[in-house]
Structures are given as structure tokens and as C-alpha cells.
């Protein structure tokens, strides 16, 4: 009967949907993280993480990525997302943005090499474009392997996540995102972005220096400005007590800013 046939087809479709997976790849010059998760409930099915003490060449990262993907069962992957986390990015207000000038925007704060290609993410909430270096060898490989995928810069989703949670009051909040690769410092006044930058760091003293540098550069008074530490809880806890000795109005936010929580 057609009813039975229809029911069987629906069951097959539901079963197929339940088995569908999404693959998230996060790449920086020090990290390679792969997450395989269920497309329905975002439950992590498999993951692999590598951290390198020193920055490595992007060709080496591509080789590592190829090897890591061999360890995953990619049969039911229906969505692939690449997240690039590097310092090679700059925010350009929409009124000044021209697609053809992306590399020109970057050359003022990034060391470019021959054959570098640029891409951009539009952040609607901030009316700005996040311009960054896209690793051409990585994107070309993923096109060959998966056919299609989406990609964006880590700071794009980080800014979107923070902006979504902000209220309309005019309080100044400094977000200090500490991850193993870099230190992101972002300043909002209400829902207006005042500052965003990424720094290299090796010690808790470096973190303190850059936070105080941003406070001074933006003419903020540290005993009136709220500072929130975000990122991986284990890393934050390693630095919180030290920072608290010098900056009193500081607090730890939850781990909702981890890559697996802000990429859908």
C-alpha cells in the first residue's frame, strides 16, 4: 500500500537525517582542531586536537589535516565548516569597504607573502567587514575533497557571540579571550564596538601587559571598567589569580565562547 510505502520512505529519511554529521575544522598556525558532531543535537561524535609549541608553516598544517581526516569516518558528513584563527585580519567599516582592496587593508598590520589571498566576512550587527588571509592551499584541498564548505574567521563568530549577549546600556566591557594560540582583546561600549585586536603571548605577564596597554590606549580607568575573561576554563584559571592582583574589576565568563559552542 502506498501509505506503508510512504511511512517507510519517511522513516528512511528520518534515519538518514539522524545519521547526518557536520565537520568543523579550526586552523591556526599553532592549532589544528577537528570536531565531528551530530547535525540534529550538535552532540560531539568524534574529535581530534593538536597543539604546536611553535608556529608551523601552512603547508605543514595541510599535511597534518590530511592525515587527521583519514582517522575520521566522513561517510555521513553533510556540512563542513572551516574556521581560521590567525592574526592576519582587520576590521573595515562597511562605508569604506571595497572587495578589490582586501589585501591593501591587510598590508598595514600584517606581513604578507607572495600568492596570499584575502577573504572577508560581513558582520551585519556591527556594519563592518572582517578582512583576513585565507589559506588558499587549505581551501583548495577542502573543495577537492568535499565539493563545498563554508568558512570564516574565528574573530567573526566571537564578535557576533559577544554582541548578541550585550545590553543597550553604555557600560564599557573589555573581553579578554585567552586561547592557546592567541589573545583576543575586545572592547564594547554598550553594543558599540570600540576596539578589537589579537596578540601573541607566552606568559601571564604578557596578558597583563596587553590588557593594561589596551586600557591605556583607549583611555579607560581600570577600576571602573568591567573586564571579562572568556575562552577555555582551564587556561583562564591559570591566569585569573595573577591578573586579579593588578586588576580588581575582573570576572570569569562561562565556556560558551569555545569554538564548539559558537559555531552552529
Language-model-detected regions and their locations in the chain:
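Hydrophobic/aromatic-enriched cytosolic interaction surfaces used to assemble or bind macromolecules
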Residues: 1-264
Amino acid at each position: 500500500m502506498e501509505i506503508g510505502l510512504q511511512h517507510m520512505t519517511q522513516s528512511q529519511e528520518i534515519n538518514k537525517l539522524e545519521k547526518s554529521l557536520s565537520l568543523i575544522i579550526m586552523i591556526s598556525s599553532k592549532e589544528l582542531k577537528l570536531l565531528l558532531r551530530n547535525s540534529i543535537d550538535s552532540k560531539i561524535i568524534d574529535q581530534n586536537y593538536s597543539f604546536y609549541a611553535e608556529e608551523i608553516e601552512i603547508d605543514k598544517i595541510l599535511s597534518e589535516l590530511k592525515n587527521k581526516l583519514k582517522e575520521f569516518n566522513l561517510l555521513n558528513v553533510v556540512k563542513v565548516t572551516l574556521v581560521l584563527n590567525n592574526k592576519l585580519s582587520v576590521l573595515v567599516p562597511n562605508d569604506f569597504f571595497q572587495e578589490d582592496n582586501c589585501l591593501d587593508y591587510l598590508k598595514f598590520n600584517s606581513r604578507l607573502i607572495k600568492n596570499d589571498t584575502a577573504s572577508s566576512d560581513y558582520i551585519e550587527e556591527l556594519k563592518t567587514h572582517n578582512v583576513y588571509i585565507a589559506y588558499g592551499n587549505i581551501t583548495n584541498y577542502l573543495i577537492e575533497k568535499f565539493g563545498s564548505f563554508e568558512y570564516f574567521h574565528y574573530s567573526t563568530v566571537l564578535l557576533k557571540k559577544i554582541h548578541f549577549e550585550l545590553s543597550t546600556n553604555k557600560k564599557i566591557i573589555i573581553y579578554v579571550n585567552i586561547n592557546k594560540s592567541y589573545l583576543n582583546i575586545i572592547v564594547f561600549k554598550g553594543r558599540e564596538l570600540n576596539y578589537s585586536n589579537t596578540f601573541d603571548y607566552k606568559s601571564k605577564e604578557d596578558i597583563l601587559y596587553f590588557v593594561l596597554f589596551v586600557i591605556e590606549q583607549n583611555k579607560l580607568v581600570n577600576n571602573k571598567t568591567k573586564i571579562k575573561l572568556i575562552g577555555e576554563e582551564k587556561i583562564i584559571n591559570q591566569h585569573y589569580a595573577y591578573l586579579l592582583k593588578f586588576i580588581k574589576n575582573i570576572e570569569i565568563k562561562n565556556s560558551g565562547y569555545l569554538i564548539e559552542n559558537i559555531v552552529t
